[in-house]
From Swiss-Prot:
Membrane topology category: Lipid-anchor
Name of this chain's protein: Rod cGMP-specific 3',5'-cyclic phosphodiesterase subunit alpha
Propeptide: 857-859
Cofactor (UniProt): a divalent metal cation
């Protein structure tokens, strides 16, 4: 048998396709695929132009796919596609133009230029300072970007869109062009352009098909790398906002420190060599002494640029962050005009117009004068710049942030603008924190100043204290120069006797005494409680405190110093005469009497409801028990003054407990709380009756802090209402004072608030006062004193007093009712007589007394 020739084998395989396929799959398929995957490069001869078969084209496509997988640089992958397209299209050159917007204006810039089949990437990659930029209304590439359609120009000399601008720059003649847009959805990403068909007069329809087919790879490359870039940018953006946010909320007091902490922390995510922040002076109106020289012609008026809200542009501080080489931060107060970040005029322009400015090639910029030589010995030069305003919530420009030289050498793009704008916008909004803090700080300082003014006028001065502590008269020196024994000796002669003045009696009346005598009586109560020596209260401080309290009460009709003293005196009487002191420690008794004296200090003569209706600042400051909380704060303010602080020698625990008791006692005077606590007090009274001996009950109560506080709260109510228990000759006068103050509030409600007051505060219903007093006694007061007399029978005189006063008011109310009834009966008799007389007259109208019709009348 002879040898089989190649022609015979080929003929056999063509006739037996199934056998050929089976044999190939079994013996060669694995090896071929392995060799193909292991190949580093497509085995296609690119040295000369020729038509490629399907196998060679498959190798080219596979090579492109592998290139996309292995390369991390979009330009390199696109460059490889363009080299192969040059071969497939037989184009002399190809170029890639990237679509971008600069300062809101769309343009096309060269990214890969003069690519041919034998080109090297480094020769074709265009640096930012060498790029050629086309507006969209210029050249074939501009037309393609605008129309978003492929363009085949057979003869450039006959095409209306062709521009020889690049030919003149490169001394190259473009004869024909094939250009196509690279799209991402409906948006143009880039333009790819092939020029000068080799061996043929122009590009053909077949070339258009090849270009569009291979543009799928370019689209894939662009999308992959664009998504990767977007992911990187969003990651950086998130990190920037996260870290800057953490630093912004660390520093709430000062805008400079806030900006510095935030900007320094995010430096690694900004992807630039340097950035500079200029802070603007926020002064809108000059002081008169700065304006006078201008008005007098001695100094020229400011004629420079201004911010959109009219402020003179003055960078009072510049902070430079240098990130290349050795990191450095420079803070320049009052920077000179020739500072490297300001000399170009760009920050001033941004502050003036509030625009974002993206300078992609700073050395070639002609509007701003950037330094073209190195800035320092490091040789660093400005290449590209991104500058944007920092705007606060009021839309005021507070500063300008300028970023220099993107680290990869490319100019700043849209994503950089978005990222930097997010940072500056966040910083601008965060200015609200230091602004708010500054406003609060100013308010706090004003409050301290006004508080100091009030204390100056309220505090007992060195002349007033001599009315009680007559140290000059006795010793010829000031109180602070005297020993405590010397002060005690003077006070012993000045203070009234408790028994003779009856300051421990429930029927005590302040009417015969002067206000100074009431101050002396108040001081004496502290000695009667034996707390002065026990707690080492400085006697000068005690005198000054009581005198200052008397001055702290306003000169109003009822809630004045006399009322404040009476409440303190009743508290003293309940503790001493009413035997309630047995439940409380000496420290608590000290706090309770002090709270009683302070409980209505700086009262305005109007109640809590009026504060809310009139939108008084107190109502905004305190949500509930408005006036009571104000009285408490006023009293504590006096106690914070060293010269008035009668608690100054208490230890920390004692001081906290005393203030705690004062808090409860003064807030408890709010009658709105009275109805909540009286049931609890009644249960305590009932419980006291279950104990066999007073001693056991006392020991139990001394250990029950909550029950003691409830009893104290009810004691404050009993003290505040104690005027209703005084002898009739006193109570009747005080009731008129209370009513007069209520009527004054009613007048305010009628005139200021344009509202009708309730009957208790209506001056026009003054005759109903006895009836209102009876209702007040029955509804509010009787329960308090009835329960206290049941709790401690020593307090029964107060119940007797209110019972007697109710009889007096009831008698007056009945008298008034009888009088009104008699007047009404007399009026009815007169009307009846008038009607009878009218009906008996000749021709009289019998219907005269009937109500008149609204629709007709009888003639």
């Amino acid at each position: 048998m002879g040898e089989v020739t190649a022609e015979e084998v080929e003929k056999f395989l063509d006739s037996n396709i199934g056998f050929a396929k089976q044999y190939y799959n079994f013996h060669y398929r694995g090896k071929v695929i392995s060799d193909l995957l292991g190949a580093k490069e497509a085995a296609v001869d690119f040295s000369n132009y020729h038509d490629v078969n399907s196998v060679e084209e498959s190798e080219i496509i596979f090579d492109l796919l592998r290139d996309v997988q292995e390369n991390l640089q979009a330009e390199k992958c696109t460059f490889n596609v363009m080299k192969k397209l040059c071969f497939l299209l037989r184009a002399d050159r190809m170029s890639l133009f990237m679509y971008r917007t600069r300062n809101g204006i769309a343009e096309l810039a060269t990214r890969l230029f003069n690519v041919h089949k034998d080109a090297v990437l480094e020769d074709c990659l265009v640096m930012p300072d060498s790029e050629i930029v086309f507006p969209l209304d210029m050249g074939v590439v501009g037309h393609v970007a605008h129309s978003k359609k492929i363009a085949n120009v057979p003869n450039t000399e006959e095409d209306e869109h062709f521009c020889d601008f690049v030919d003149n720059l490169t001394e190259y003649q473009t004869k024909n062009i094939l250009a196509s847009p690279i799209m991402n959805g409906k948006d143009v990403v880039a333009i790819i352009m092939a020029v000068n068909k080799i061996d043929e007069p122009h590009f053909t329809k077949r070339d258009e098909e090849i270009l569009l087919k291979y543009l799928n790879f370019v689209n894939l490359i662009m999308k992959v790398f664009h998504l990767s870039y977007l992911h990187n940018c969003e990651t950086r953006r998130g990190q920037i906002l996260l870290w800057s946010g953490s630093k912004v909320f660390e520093e709430l007091t000062d805008i400079e420190r806030q900006f510095h902490k935030a900007l320094y922390t995010v430096r690694a995510f900004l992807n630039c060599d340097r950035y500079s922040v200029g802070l603007l002076d926020m002064t809108k109106q000059k002081e008169f002494f700065d304006v006078w020289p201008v008005l007098m012609g001695e100094a020229p008026a400011y004629s420079g640029p201004r911010t959109p809200d009219g402020r003179e542009i003055n960078f009072y501080k510049v902070i430079d962050y240098i990130l290349h080489g050795k990191e450095d931060i420079k803070v320049i107060p009052n920077p000179p005009a020739d500072h490297w970040a300001l000399v170009s005029g760009l920050p001033t322009y941004v502050a003036q117009n509030g625009l974002i400015c993206n300078i992609m090639n700073a050395p070639a910029e002609d509007f701003f004068e950037f330094q073209k030589e190195p800035l320092d010995e490091s040789g660093w030069m400005i290449k590209n710049v991104l500058s944007m305003p920092i705007v606060n919530k009021k839309e005021e420009i507070v500063g300008v942030a300028t970023f220099y030289n993107r680290k990869d050498g490319k100019p700043f793009d849209d994503m950089d603008e978005t990222l930097m704008e997010s940072l500056t916008q966040f910083l601008g909004w965060s200015v609200l924190n230091p602004d708010t803090y500054e406003s609060m700080n100013k308010l706090e300082n004003r409050k301290d100043i006004f508080q100091d003014i009030v204390k100056y006028h309220v505090k007992c001065d060195n002349e007033e204290i001599q009315k009680i502590l007559k140290t000059r008269e006795v010793y010829g020196k000031e109180p602070w120069e005297c020993e405590e024994e010397e002060l005690a000796e003077i006070l012993q002669g000045e203070l009234p006797d408790a028994e003779s003045y009856e300051i421990n009696k429930f029927h005590f009346s302040d009417l015969p005494l002067t206000e100074l005598e009431l101050v002396k009586c108040g001081i004496q109560m502290y000695y009667e409680l034996r707390v002065v020596d026990k707690f080492h209260i400085p006697q000068e401080a005690l005198v000054r405190f009581m005198y200052s309290l008397s001055k702290g009460y306003r000169r109003i009709t009822y809630h004045n110093w006399r009322h404040g003293f009476n409440v303190g005196q009743t508290m003293f009487s309940l503790l001493v005469t009413g035997k309630l002191k047995r439940y409380f420690t000496d420290l608590e008794a000290l706090a309770m009497v002090t709270a009683a004296f302070c409980h209505d200090i700086d009262h305005r003569g109007t109640n809590n409801l009026y504060q809310m209706k009139s939108q008084n600042p107190l109502a905004k400051l305190h949500g509930s028990s408005i006036l009571e909380r104000h009285h408490l704060e006023f009293g504590k303010t006096l106690l914070r003054d060293e010269s008035l602080n009668i608690f100054q020698n208490l230890n920390r625990r004692q001081h906290e407990h005393a203030i705690h008791m004062m808090d409860i006692a003064i807030i408890a005077t709010d009658l709105a709380l009275y109805f909540k606590k009286r049931t609890m007090f009644q249960k305590i009274v009932d419980q006291s009756k279950t104990y066999e001996s007073t001693q056991e009950w006392t020991q139990y109560m001394m250990l029950e802090q909550t029950r003691k506080e409830i009893v104290m709260a009810m004691m404050m109510t009993a003290c505040d209402l104690s005027a209703i228990t005084k002898p009739w000759e006193v109570q009747s006068k005080v009731a008129l004072l209370v009513a007069a103050e209520f009527w004054e509030q009613g007048d305010l409600e009628r005139t200021v608030l344009q509202q009708n007051p309730i009957p208790m505060m209506d001056r026009n219903k003054a005759d109903e006062l006895p009836k209102l007093q009876v209702g007040f006694i029955d509804f509010v007061c009787t329960f308090v004193y009835k329960e206290f007399s049941r709790f401690h029978e020593e307090i029964t005189p107060m119940l007797d007093g209110i019972t007697n006063n109710r009889k007096e008011w009831k008698a007056l109310a009945d008298e008034y009712e009888a009088k009104m009834k008699a007047l009404e009966e007399e009026k009815q008799k007169q009307q009846a007589a008038k009607q009878a007389a009218s009906g008996n007259q000749p021709g009289g109208n019998p219907l005269q007394g009937a109500p008149a019709s609204k629709s007709c009348c009888i003639q």
